């Protein structure tokens, strides 16, 4: 069973990291692999339970229950508000992937360690080789050595890619460039980190660049002295200014959409909405989903929902960043920090990609790390 679990975990990581939003195979008419993996995780869970090939920690169970409170709350507020059931279910859909965390959280200790290690390895490989490939694409495109129309014709068949007018593009899997940059920086592989950050710059995604840089700065505060932190602040500021210059007036459309969303909430909020929200299935202007995730949470679940969703994230981050002492805990906490903050401008955290990251971080910070510390204390006592 262990080998079967390892193969499944490896394939799951590859699909989530490289597959991004899960729509790469959309043009082929193939049933989404993500749904099949979701179902298969429950089949494996049953086999693990039947064969006693599982391990449960109280903290993982407590955090899992707390994580589920948020979609349950949004669902019931939506029902009480009289929102259409189809719209409510549309909002619930991304959170269903949280149920797959039951599989992760009940794995045996060795498989939990394997899950975290294989996740880091696959992100490392994808971030580096994906960045090199993307940088090569931009160079060849600017030298006129690529047929952009042909590339656009093929890649635009799926909704996974978002093209810029100058030929640059962003894929949802590119969020893992930011994760890879954090891993490389904490591992002190600075050249690799710079290559990945350069690729992020060339995607022209301001939010990903900004919050990757902030995550690297937080890592530097723990790892380096003041002069290196200053260098990172200056370098990050320069890169962001370059990004703003590259994007230019093209950012006005997306900025105006975000501003209109904020203005709509401001004009329509009342005390009940502010406290309890309007529930899942409620709209901001004519959309169920918006780019500013915190605003969407506030609109649909109020400050109560913000509190419910934020508390477990803060607990995980604070424990990994301040209380645990290992390099991997620092890495994991900053990956979570990036996932939370990048969701201010791009929906990421409560997607299958973001939910899986939450699961992996919880595994390390609240399960693996605790057992390792306990074992070290026991060894020391002997």
Curated annotation (Swiss-Prot):
It is found in: Cell inner membrane. Keywords: Cell inner membrane, Cell membrane, Lipopolysaccharide biosynthesis, Membrane, Transferase, Transmembrane, Transmembrane helix. This is O-antigen polymerase. The gene is wzy. Pathway: Bacterial outer membrane biogenesis; LPS O-antigen biosynthesis. The chain crosses the membrane at residues 4-22, 35-54, 63-81, 95-112, 126-146, 168-187, 190-206, 209-226, 230-247, 301-318, 330-349, 353-370. Residues 23-34, 82-94, 147-167, 207-208, 248-300, 350-352 are periplasmic. One of its GO terms (molecular function) is transferase activity. It catalyses: n lipid-linked O-antigen repeat units = a lipid-linked O antigen + (n-1) polyisoprenyl diphosphate. It comes from Shigella flexneri. Polymerase involved in the biosynthesis of the lipopolysaccharide (LPS). Catalyzes the polymerization of the O-antigen repeat units on the periplasmic face of the inner membrane, leading to the formation of the lipid-linked O-antigen molecule. The keyword Transferase applies. The keyword Iron-sulfur does not apply. One of its GO terms (biological process) is lipopolysaccharide biosynthetic process. Disruption phenotype: Mutants produce a semi-rough LPS, which contains only one O-antigen repeat unit. It is a multi-pass membrane protein. Residues 1-3, 55-62, 113-125, 188-189, 227-229, 319-329, 371-382 are cytoplasmic. One of its GO terms (cellular component) is plasma membrane. Its EC number is 2.4.99.27.
């Amino acid at each position: 069973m262990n080998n079967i679990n390892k193969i499944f975990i490896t394939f799951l990581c590859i699909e989530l990291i490289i597959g991004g939003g899960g729509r790469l195979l959309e043009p082929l008419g193939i049933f989404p692999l993500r749904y099949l993996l979701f179902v298969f995780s429950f089949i494996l869970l049953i086999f693990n339970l039947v064969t006693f090939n599982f391990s449960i920690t109280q903290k993982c169970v407590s955090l899992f229950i707390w994580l589920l409170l948020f979609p349950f709350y949004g669902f019931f507020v939506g029902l009480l508000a009289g929102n259409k059931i189809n719209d409510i279910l549309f909002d619930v859909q991304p959170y269903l992937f949280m149920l797959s965390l039951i599989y992760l959280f009940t794995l045996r200790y060795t498989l939990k360690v394997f899950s975290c290690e294989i996740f880091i390895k696959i992100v490392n490989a994808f971030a580096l080789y994906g960045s090199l490939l993307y940088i090569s694409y931009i160079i060849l495109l600017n030298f006129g050595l690529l047929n952009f129309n042909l590339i656009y014709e093929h890649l635009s068949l799926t909704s996974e890619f978002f093209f810029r007018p100058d030929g640059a593009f962003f894929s949802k899997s590119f969020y893992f460039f930011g994760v890879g940059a954090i891993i490389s920086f904490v591992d002190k592989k600075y050249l690799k980190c710079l290559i990945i950050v350069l690729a992020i710059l060339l995607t022209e995604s301001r939010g990903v660049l900004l919050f990757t840089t902030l995550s690297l700065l937080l890592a530097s505060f723990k790892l380096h002295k003041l002069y290196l932190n200053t260098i990172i602040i200056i370098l990050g500021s320069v890169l962001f200014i370059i990004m703003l210059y590259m994007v230019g007036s093209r950012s006005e459309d997306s900025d105006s959409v975000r501003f209109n969303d904020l203005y709509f909430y401001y004009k329509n909020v009342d005390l009940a909405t502010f406290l309890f929200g309007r529930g899942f299935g409620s709209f901001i202007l004519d959309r169920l989903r918006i780019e500013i995730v915190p605003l969407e949470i506030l609109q649909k679940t109020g400050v109560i929902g913000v509190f419910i969703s934020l508390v477990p994230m803060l607990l995980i981050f604070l424990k990994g960043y301040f209380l645990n002492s290992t390099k991997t805990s620092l890495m994991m906490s900053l990956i979570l920090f990036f996932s939370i903050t990048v969701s201010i401008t791009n929906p990421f955290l409560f997607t299958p990609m973001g939910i899986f990251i939450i699961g992996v971080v919880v595994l390390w910070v609240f399960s693996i790390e605790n057992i390792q510390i306990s074992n070290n204390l026991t060894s020391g006592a002997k």
